[in-house]
């Protein structure tokens, strides 16, 4: 039926989930203990709101549920959430037959089973050119900021929404020293709870703090089981993840921060004077870490839209292939439709192809790179042969220095009091209880190390040299020095091995990721309950970290250009990004096979905040463009109309997904030739002339018409051009990459081009 469960194709294209790393459902989180042991949590999505009165909307949700259950009391007990601000819908405990029945209601677009998923700085801003940092931090000092920071007052009127695991409010990064009044448009609030006092813990920096647990608890009989859920029944952060991401996006200045002396410097967020609103939807569960219920996440989105945040930073991910029953991206669509940029993580499932998640065209999807900083550990063998190895933050050797005997684990020797060498290819054995001091583990470059600082990780080449030394020495020894901090060359940035890669497996013509930002060994504040925290700070790695980097930059752009749409800001980032490092070195992609990074690794490139502030031209998108995407993806008129809250018809003929006005061109199946269009908006000098510069992919001829864009007046800031791609390949090919740049001599507006040839048989 048209109004019940959507077609399988539509559901698949809607499948965007809301939390990082794993999609494993937790066996202990069931509906057992509920009034009906067969009941589960479902989200009933009704589309755009029909009116602005939230009380009337909630009443209508109860009426619909009462009609289904034939009991006002049962409807009240079944209802978990009413979504009434950004969109219309509710979450409720239903049996599968009840879910099927309500899905057939003419006002229901989709019924979505609730899911439980697992949660996936000093140097950053200097590295990206967003500096200098003030030398004084008193309220009376005038911060010596320049460029984007200066022109936006460091984001003082902006509001960053962070959907995560909450906040540790006592952290110095949330001090409100020198901040003016809270923006008048703010409609949110702080909610008190366990060890969180709204009056005491919120201030002019942390202006919002809410928490959502009903969806999670409903899957466990409605109980907050302290044995299983080791968390606070409030916005207070038990895992440290939310505190870390909020710091990166908008933390205040904190000088002399470090992790055991590493990465020492001033910690601050991208928009250090922006206000932070924390929406806790993720909870610390024993054995699983941070987990989140999609019903809770929807409510966080709903409230954030109502509260009028400027950006939503959600360090999230999804399973690959994406689950056809997860349509949580709908909440993000409604946020974007209200002008809120939603910044999402590319995921940590790299470095293989087609591992990218968060692929909807309205999301700003972020990959992770290293910084021009490393933390090398010095390994000195007894023959004075020396090696330097660098690890991710989670497995740094912070000392003190050790000097021990050295042995290979596979040898029949006593390892007590020694450092041992292992290879991951030989299935490392358990060393518990054997008296081993440290382990040098030689591993594949694509493997992400476990967070254990008793391990020193290296590659096979160095491991083989160490093994040869052991084999040829009667009493081998080793000295391992604590990691040190190295910045600048030769520590040039690379796309991290764990960062998920394109191409997009759901909509191949939509390039993902959009952009890359630093996400490896990022220093930020954490909860003191975070294992290994040092004076309230810790180094973490992941696209969880690169996402708030971009969120902080977005609020600066929003402050500078308040009328820009989320799509315009994404375009500004993509078209001005670095395709080499800030120092001019090539950007490589880490993984099993090291290579030069391409658009499937980093989208447009490494984010360049200062350039993004003045992009010259932008590839803008609005609701009409998203409608064309939905039409090209197979959505029917009825479904689109309900999502938008107004009658909508797809154009005839159906739009091509190649014509979606993205700041990129991706042609997944070029047979002979194809022509597509793009539209640019002049946001630079009113009178401008841009000329096309084409770098065609191998074996592909690109032709642009016209080759010159002339902007003559403020009334004519929008121009359209066409691009014809023609292949000379005679057999099927992989993807080849190029670019299209519009230049006026000052601005270089570059979009990546990715083309794969497919020959019909």
Swiss-Prot record:
Which residues belong to the propeptide? 22-120
The name of this protein is Subtilisin-like protease SBT3.15
Query: Where on the tree of life does the source sit, at the highest rank?
Result: Eukaryota
> What species is this protein from?
Arabidopsis thaliana (Mouse-ear cress)
- Cited Gene3D superfamilies: 2.60.40.2310, 3.50.30.30, Peptidase S8 propeptide/proteinase inhibitor I9, Peptidase S8/S53 domain
Gene Ontology terms, MF aspect: serine-type endopeptidase activity
Matching PROSITE patterns, A to Z?
SUBTILASE, SUBTILASE_SER
Domain Inhibitor I9: residue ranges: 41-119
């Amino acid at each position: 039926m048209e109004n019940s469960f959507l077609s399988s194709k539509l559901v698949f294209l809607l499948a965007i989930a809301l939390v990082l790393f794993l999609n494993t459902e937790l066996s202990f989180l069931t509906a057992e203990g509920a009034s009906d042991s067969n009941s589960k949590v479902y989200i009933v999505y009704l589309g755009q709101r029909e009116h602005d009165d939230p009380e009337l909307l909630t009443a209508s949700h109860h009426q619909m549920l009462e009609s289904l259950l034939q009991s006002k009391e049962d409807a009240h007990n079944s209802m978990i959430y009413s979504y009434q601000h950004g969109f219309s819908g509710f979450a409720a405990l239903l049996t599968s037959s009840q879910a099927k029945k309500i899905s057939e209601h003419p006002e229901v677009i989709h019924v979505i089973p609730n899911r439980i998923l697992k949660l996936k700085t000093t140097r950053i801003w200097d590295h990206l050119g967003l500096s200098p940092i003030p030398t004084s931090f008193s309220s009376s000092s005038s911060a010596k900021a320049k460029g984007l920071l200066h022109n936006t007052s460091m984001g003082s009127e902006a509001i960053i929404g962070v959907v995560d695991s909450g906040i540790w409010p006592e952290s110095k990064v949330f001090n409100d020293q020198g901040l003016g009044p809270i923006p008048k448009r703010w409609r949110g609030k702080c909610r008190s709870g366990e060890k969180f006092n709204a009056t005491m813990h919120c201030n002019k920096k942390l202006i919002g703090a809410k928490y959502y647990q009903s969806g999670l608890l409903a899957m466990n009989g409605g109980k907050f089981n302290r044995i299983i859920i080791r968390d606070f029944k409030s916005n207070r952060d038990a895992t440290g993840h939310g505190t870390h991401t909020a710091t990166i996006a908008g933390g205040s200045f904190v000088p002399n921060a470090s992790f055991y002396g590493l990465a020492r410097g001033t910690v601050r967020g991208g928009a250090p004077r922006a206000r932070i609103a924390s929406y806790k939807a993720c909870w610390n569960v024993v054995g699983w870490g941070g987990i989140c219920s999609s019903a809770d996440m929807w409510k966080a989105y709903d409230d954030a839209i109502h509260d009028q945040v400027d950006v939503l930073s959600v360090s999230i991910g999804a399973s690959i292939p994406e689950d056809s029953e997860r349509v949580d991206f709908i909440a993000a669509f409604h946020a974007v439709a209200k002008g809120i940029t939603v910044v999402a993580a590319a995921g940590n499932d790299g470095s293989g192809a087609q591992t990218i998640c968060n692929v909807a065209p309205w999301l700003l999807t972020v990959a992770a790179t290293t910084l021009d900083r490393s933390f090398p550990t010095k390994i000195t063998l007894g023959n004075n042969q020396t090696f330097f190895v660098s690890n991710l933050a989670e497995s740094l050797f912070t000392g003190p220095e050790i000097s021990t005997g050295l042995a290979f684990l596979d040898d029949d020797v006593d390892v007590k009091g020694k450092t041992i060498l292992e290879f991951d290819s030989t299935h490392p054995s358990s060393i518990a209880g054997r008296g081993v001091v440290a382990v040098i583990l030689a591993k594949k470059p694509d493997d992400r190390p476990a967070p254990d600082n008793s391990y020193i990780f290296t590659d096979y080449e160095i491991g083989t040299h160490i093994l040869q030394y052991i084999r040829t020495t009667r009493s081998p020894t080793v000295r391992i020095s604590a990691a040190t901090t190295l910045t600048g060359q030769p520590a040039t940035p690379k796309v991290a091995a764990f960062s998920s890669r394109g191409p997009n497996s759901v909509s191949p013509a939509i390039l993902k990721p959009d952009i890359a930002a630093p996400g490896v060994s990022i220093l930020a504040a954490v909860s003191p309950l975070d294992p290994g925290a040092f004076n309230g700070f810790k180094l973490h790695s992941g696209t969880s970290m690169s996402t708030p980097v971009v969120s902080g930059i977005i609020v600066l752009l929003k402050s500078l250009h308040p009328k820009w749409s989320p799509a315009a800001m994404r375009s500004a980032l993509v078209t001005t990004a670095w395709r080499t490092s800030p120092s001019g070195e090539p950007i490589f992609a880490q993984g099993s096979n090291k290579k030069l990074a391409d658009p499937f690794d980093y989208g447009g490139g490494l984010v360049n905040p200062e350039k993004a502030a003045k992009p010259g031209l932008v590839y803008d998108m609005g609701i009409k463009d998203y409608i064309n995407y939905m039409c090209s993806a197979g959505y029917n008129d009825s479904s689109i109309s309900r999502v938008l809250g107004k009658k909508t018809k797809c154009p005839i003929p159906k739009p091509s997904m190649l014509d979606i006005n993205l700041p990129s061109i991706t042609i997944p199946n070029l047979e002979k030739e194809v022509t597509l269009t793009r539209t640019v908006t002049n946001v630079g000098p009113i009178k401008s002339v841009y000329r096309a510069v084409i770098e065609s992919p191998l074996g592909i001829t690109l032709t642009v018409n016209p080759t010159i864009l002339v902007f003559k007046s403020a009334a004519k800031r929008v121009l359209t051009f066409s691009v014809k791609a023609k292949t000379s390949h005679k057999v099927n090919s992989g993807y080849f990459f190029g670019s299209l740049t519009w230049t006026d001599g000052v601005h270089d507006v570059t979009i990546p081009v990715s083309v794969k040839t497919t020959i019909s048989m």
